[in-house]
Amino acid sequence: MRPSVLVQTSSIVSSALVSSAIGYAIGWPVSKYFDSNTTMRLLLSPVIGLGIFGAVAVSIFHFLPITAINLMLIVLGLSAVAFWLSKGTIDPLLRSPASPGFCWFTVAFLLCLLPAFEIIPQHYGGSVGVGHPIWDHAKIAIVNEIAQNGLPPANPFHSEAGSPNTLIYYYVWHFIAACSSVITGATGWEADIALTGMTALFSTFVVTWLAVARSRSAYAAWWSLPLLFVGSLKPAVRFVFGKWLEKWMAPEHGLQTWIIQAPWVPQHVFSGTLALIAIMAYLRILYSNAGRNMALAVFMGAILASAYGSSMWAGSLSLLLILPLVGALSVSHVLKVKRLLEVLISLSVTVVITLLCAAVLIREQSAILHTRKVVEFWVFPIFAGDYWFLDIPGFWLVLVFLEFGIIYLSFLIWSFARPSDDSKRYAHIDCALTVSVLAPLFCTQILHSVIMYNDLGWRVLIPSMLVMTALTSGLFSTTIGKGTLVGRLTTITAIILLAPSILVGAKSVYSNTFKFQVEGPDSEEGTAFKASPEMWKAVREVTPPNEAVANNPLDLASVTYTPANISWAILSQRRHCGTTLDFLRAYAAQLTPKKASEIYNFFVRAFAGLATEDHLRIMKEKYRCRTLVVTSRDGLWGKPVLDNNSVYKLVSEKKGKWRIYR
């Protein structure tokens, strides 16, 4: 029997090792298509392997139970297929003459622990707190749902009689976390922490591969690490000029750099990283005359499906913009070398494999189109007041510069630098990388999502951000300190912007990783959160994993920066029949905004102490709340209706703390 602790380090480590093993087992043979350098293939393999595994296994496990034996058989089977399709000599997309050494791998691993640290519990006195990103990791409930009940996942955030209650969300990344949970016995929270850290590391690997391979300089690997940890320049501008910025800029939420996105939304970072791999595979299919593209087309199809299945924005919408443009730019070359039929056949194979792997996800997610509008056109508001004609240039000249500072300015320097003979040899790659930067940024400017917040705007540009970081790393490694115009501009950019950008990123890491441990405060809710595993263990003992519980949507709301019942989401390992409003809007997307508000208000009123026996009956019969969990913090605690009703009976309690009814 596991002790009632929040997370165990051994489970996190074992989950990380399982994810890495899956990635390398499947991705290692496929990496031959991208680079001939063995060390560089170590950088590419895990993302490729996890991408292929995620898409294929999600489809398979809609028909098979998710067990450790089945998972190992699927991994072995996919690894065998990957080795078979990659056997023999393969002419890679790039042949890197340099690669990072062991010291770089060690430093990269240690730095990429930081995003994982932002979602682990932090102790101060008798209390436990969590960093701000944990709010977006309420999706740990999805990991637990898949691990316990298989696919397709039921919605762990809402249940209602007469409704299919299917989860409408892109969950391939969470499925991968659930697989490591099944194999190791880790909780959803532990598996989520592990995969968050591994996603950050593998994303860093791919950025570094591109930086080193394109610049042909091992020093680019060292530049990639600080550049991934840069933050927005806005705090630095505020520090120098006070509130001057707020007076003339619109209050719209800005964009986010890698060090913000990696701990908050690892599924989107994973998807954006896969998008970068897919673009490179696409380039080889379009421009390589060496053959073997049919096998690569199969792998690309699975990677595309996994990118889509992990993020509708970073790996789906971004690629819908990038790939057609890159393809259009390649037409003259394809016609010149008379490879049109070969390319069309390869791309047809890619499309077929993508649809086969993504079909179940497309079918599940298409249900949202019947109830909700997903995106709207707009012009990203930059300046205060209704000056859209100024907002258009302001987006590129002001907002993107403030948000992405050093990597955006360096990308512009790289774009206008005089091409060398080496650059001309890779002109098709450079052209594709330029498109990969500009197309997602343009999308952010003219489209925004409306389900909840502007997730589209923040996530669709992840491939753009990764490419800019790689290009900046390469630029710095080859031009800093040189007497040319490009060298001087690059040196000045690094001197002025690097330090403040890293300081802003470091401040974000400190706030989410160490601040609570240093400053506290010690609070009643923090103490209750620390003790909550005992309550949820008792809930699991009386509640099967395929049933839902009713618990106050606002229980321990002060633990997170935005009020939410994070204790249920990350610790209960059970479904909830009506959770926090933000969670209902985001993850029960089949509900209209009005319906989501009605459900949320119903549960809030009930736990505030206004519940009658009829309310309790509606809970149990309409919303399928088989278990009712009441704590001493709830207004419902001690109300006579709990002792005198025909709906729920007391089955477990800890005197003065909590009671469980069935």
Swiss-Prot record:
Signal peptide: none annotated. Its main location: membrane. Keywords: Cell membrane, Membrane, Plasmid, Transmembrane, Transmembrane helix. Coiled coil: none annotated. It is a multi-pass membrane protein. The chain crosses the membrane at residues 10-30, 46-66, 68-88, 101-121, 167-187, 193-213, 217-237, 263-283, 285-305, 312-332, 342-362, 373-393, 394-414, 432-452, 460-480, 485-505. One of its GO terms (cellular component) is plasma membrane. It is found in: Cell membrane. This is Uncharacterized protein y4nK.
